[in-house]
């Protein structure tokens, strides 16, 4: 953790307590750390552990016909940019904070009950960046419906106003040549390339498993955040097709 002398130490206490709470919720143990004086507050954790080889989720192996499911709304980077500009509404801030503070633990518990083709978490490369990665590794094409994807409250409006983090433009430059945009509005591209903090799980699952998985998501309380965003198709000239 890095922390400046000019801030109240009670803030540091809250940061450490919040981190410890999430570590405990995840079922892990916090075993130590280092602290330094810094001009800006910084906090982060690294994870060390073991996983059974049969329980590893791969980010490749998607099969044509699979259904693509996303467990959280996207747009956290854009909402955070609006917060920095002091233009975010209180309700948008609350929703973004709730989503970012939510672990993927419940989603993982649902996913591990099924024989999914592939699964990854959406982070700094944005939804499209991770879709490109997964589709490329699987040698398939993803067909995504931009209007079926769940977005955070007001994220579209903030993106329309230009409140887009620099990372979104870097993500776009990296993989836009692999995306068939069609007539999709530029604002939606900003949302799809928006770097996510604590993003959800992107899951590729067979149609046979899809309905039962969605039933379990609803029963687990994720019905307000999970969305079916598209399907997997045989590989074409582009890795991603937007509709």
Regions flagged by a language model, labelled:
Residues 1-243:
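Helix-biased detector of long, well-ordered alpha-helical tracts
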């Amino acid at each position: 953790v890095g922390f400046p002398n000019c801030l109240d130490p009670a803030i540091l206490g809250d940061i450490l307590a919040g981190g410890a709470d999430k570590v405990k919720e995840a079922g892990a143990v916090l075993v130590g750390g280092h602290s330094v004086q810094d001009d800006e507050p910084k906090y982060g954790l690294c994870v060390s552990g073991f996983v059974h080889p049969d329980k590893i989720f791969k980010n490749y192996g998607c099969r044509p016909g699979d259904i693509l499911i996303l467990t959280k709304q996207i747009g956290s980077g854009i909402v955070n940019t609006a917060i920095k500009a002091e233009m975010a509404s209180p309700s948008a801030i609350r929703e973004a904070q709730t989503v970012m503070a939510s672990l993927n633990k419940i989603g993982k518990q649902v996913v591990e009950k099924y024989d999914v083709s592939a699964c990854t978490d959406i982070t700094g490369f944005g939804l499209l960046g991770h879709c490109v990665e997964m589709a490329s590794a699987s040698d398939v094409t993803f067909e995504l419906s931009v209007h079926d994807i769940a977005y955070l409250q007001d994220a579209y409006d903030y993106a329309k106003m230009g409140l887009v983090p620099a990372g979104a433009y870097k993500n776009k430059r990296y993989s836009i040549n692999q995306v068939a945009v069609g007539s999709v509005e530029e604002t939606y591209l900003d949302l799809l390339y928006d770097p996510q903090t604590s993003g959800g799980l992107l899951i590729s699952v067979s149609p046979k498993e899809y309905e039962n998985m969605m039933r379990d998501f609803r029963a687990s309380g994720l019905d307000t955040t999970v969305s079916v965003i598209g399907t997997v198709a045989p590989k074409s000239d582009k890795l991603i097709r937007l509709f």
